[in-house]
């Protein structure tokens, strides 16, 4: 695979596209205009926790959704709006379109991709799966529509453990793609027989245990929150490990007043909103300043700007199209995930 060289090329491409900061007046203008366009077009804005705070705030203000990728998929599927504007990365827009082929799905930019998606080309992955036909294919949501169509199950980080445990209980062996760190974490937690694809997130892979230990020494009373896309040595230092929504819940429920957070810093918007009396500190990345590749913020998530949201709504640009031949194949593993998580929710509610 050529993932490392691909990352460097993509980063160079992104460096030329960093958005310029807006004045307070410009920001207020865009927020008003976007809200009006959403209402006019019967559209709803859904945003991921890793988007910039202004995008998350706008989604909340306009009756949309700020959540992890599982809830984004569920919300877009259930909301009556005819247009869904997805502020996130491309696989999220594709997922919304697969689940809602009759709706118009827009994204602020179609260039917002994901290193996990890039690192799992469908031809290579299909060939890998064909070599192990006896295994159940489980793919992370951070993959293309074509890769999802090759899978038996799609999972997000908030439901991956439970789904893999269920498959393991049924005696199934697994192919896992694309994030090797998340796959390794699930394998350790469940003991499942898993073949792991060799992919990684450019944000989470930058967290390193030495720097995290150094920071913990500065804040000895802080709890460490870690996303399982991080390397094992980082995960092992965590007081809580989980998806974005699970880390937010941990911040609310743990008694600590200070947290060191090893995930994309976009999550701080929701953590600070829900826990205004607590302090959140970015976990250090492997590099400092200009030396780090992501500096704890996904460069593709940062491409979701107010200007691009408004332009997309007014011009209809950034519309997501998925090959109609892929949709029936890709919707099956997605529906399995949604049905599984819905059944789990109902079970929890019944036991409450």
UniProtKB/Swiss-Prot annotation:
One GO MF term attached to the UniProt entry: 4 iron, 4 sulfur cluster binding
Stretches assigned to coiled coil: none
Major localization listed first in the record, in broad terms: cytoplasm
Pfam families assigned to the protein according to its UniProt record, in alphabetical order: NadA (PF02445)
Cofactor binding summary note: Binds 1 [4Fe-4S] cluster per subunit.
Cell compartment(s), UniProt: Cytoplasm
Keywords in alphabetical order: 4Fe-4S, Cytoplasm, Iron, Iron-sulfur, Metal-binding, Pyridine nucleotide biosynthesis, Transferase
One GO term of the biological process aspect: 'de novo' NAD biosynthetic process from L-aspartate
Superkingdom to which the source organism belongs: Bacteria
Biological role stated in the UniProt entry: Catalyzes the condensation of iminoaspartate with dihydroxyacetone phosphate to form quinolinate.
Name of the protein in its database record: Quinolinate synthase
High-level lineage: Bacteria, Pseudomonadati, Pseudomonadota, Gammaproteobacteria, Pseudomonadales
